[in-house]
Amino acid sequence: MLSPQEAAKIYHANYIRNSGAIGVLWAIFTICFAIVNIVCFIQPYWIGDGVDTPQAGYFGLFHFCIGSGFSKELTCTGSFTEFSSIPSGAFKAASFFIGLSMTLIIGCIVSFGLFFFCNTATVYKICAWMQLCSAACLVLGCMIFPDGWDADEVKRMCGEKTDKYSLGACSVRWAYILAIIGILDALILSFLAFVLGNRLDSLMAEQLKLESKDDGNA
């Protein structure tokens, strides 16, 4: 029959092996979230035209395309590098926060390299804080973005009834919905990283106690 110390050592070894597998899944989903974040930042499909809109078109954070008259041709403009071309202060703020969220999650992925040099639990906690901050920036970006719907360019596409937080004849598109889903994803990833980091810390403390007991018995 195994002694309590031997049983504890087997438990620790099994847990570390299982947590390693969970950590790999966490890393994969973090990379997936980064891709989602980049797509939301770049794609101009946050809001778009509807059946009754005066003009065809679609808007992103900083890039937008609007039709002209009865022509099906869309005129596109706006660039993050040309901040003055963004039609609304709210769109500029939303672009900044979503861009910051993207930068943080890319920084989190770069931090994976620290697993080879630093304490694993500490790296998990660093990544958890970065993911939590990334989620907070996404929340701010998604909340601020509708404040710019009263911009003249948006009204030209969506109609005069369009106002802050009211889209008039337009509708929300997939990139906006994806960004909202990304918030939940980032929060779950952050929570999981905190759990993994704290659990590894407690396991290390227990292992040190067992080793000290073994040394004392010897």
Swiss-Prot record:
It comes from the Eukaryota. It is a multi-pass membrane protein. Its main location: membrane. Keywords: Membrane, Transmembrane, Transmembrane helix. The keyword Transmembrane applies. It is found in: Membrane. The keyword DNA repair does not apply. One of its GO terms (biological process) is sensory perception of sound. GO terms for cellular component: plasma membrane. The chain crosses the membrane at residues 22-42, 96-116, 126-146, 177-197. Belongs to the LHFP family. This is LHFPL tetraspan subfamily member 3 protein. It comes from Xenopus laevis (African clawed frog).
